[in-house]
Amino acid sequence: MLAAFQLTVLALIATSFLMVIGVPVIFASPEGWVKSKNFVFSGALLWISLVFAVGILNSFVV
């Protein structure tokens, strides 16, 4: 269970890093929002899911 928790935290950190870098680049590029809207929404959904997964797994690890 500890390994699953650690991998989920690692995925959350990686997703957060990609979103912090990717979203401003998308907004800065011409017509970036129109073409990359699905990337932003998919990344946000993945990030929210990982936050809940970390919270749930944390209750099993502690």
From Swiss-Prot:
Q: Which keywords belong to this entry? A: Chloroplast, Membrane, Photosynthesis, Photosystem II, Plastid, Reaction center, Thylakoid, Transmembrane, Transmembrane helix
How is this protein annotated for GO cellular component? chloroplast thylakoid membrane; photosystem II reaction center
| Cell compartments where the protein resides | Plastid, Chloroplast thylakoid membrane
Which parts of the chain span the membrane according to its record?
8-28, 41-61
Query: What Pfam families does the entry give?
Result: Ycf9 (PF01737)
Question: What topology does the record note for this protein and the membrane?
Answer: Multi-pass membrane protein
* Entry annotated with the keyword Heme: no
Instruction: Kindly state a single biological-process term from the GO annotations of this entry.
Output: photosynthesis
Sorted alphabetically, which InterPro entries does this protein's record hold? PSII_PsbZ (IPR002644), PSII_PsbZ_sf (IPR036512)
Family of the protein in this entry? Belongs to the PsbZ family.
Q: What does this protein do?
A: May control the interaction of photosystem II (PSII) cores with the light-harvesting antenna, regulates electron flow through the 2 photosystem reaction centers. PSII is a light-driven water plastoquinone oxidoreductase, using light energy to abstract electrons from H(2)O, generating a proton gradient subsequently used for ATP formation.
HAMAP family assigned to the protein according to its UniProt record, in alphabetical order: PSII_PsbZ
Q: Which PANTHER family match?
A: PHOTOSYSTEM II REACTION CENTER PROTEIN Z
Subunit structure and binding partners: PSII is composed of 1 copy each of membrane proteins PsbA, PsbB, PsbC, PsbD, PsbE, PsbF, PsbH, PsbI, PsbJ, PsbK, PsbL, PsbM, PsbT, PsbY, PsbZ, Psb30/Ycf12, at least 3 peripheral proteins of the oxygen-evolving complex and a large number of cofactors. It forms dimeric complexes.
Instruction: Name it.
Output: Photosystem II reaction center protein Z
Which organism does this sequence originate in?
Mesostigma viride
Q: What is the lineage of its organism?
A: Eukaryota, Viridiplantae, Streptophyta, Mesostigmatophyceae, Mesostigmatales
Q: Which gene encodes it?
A: psbZ
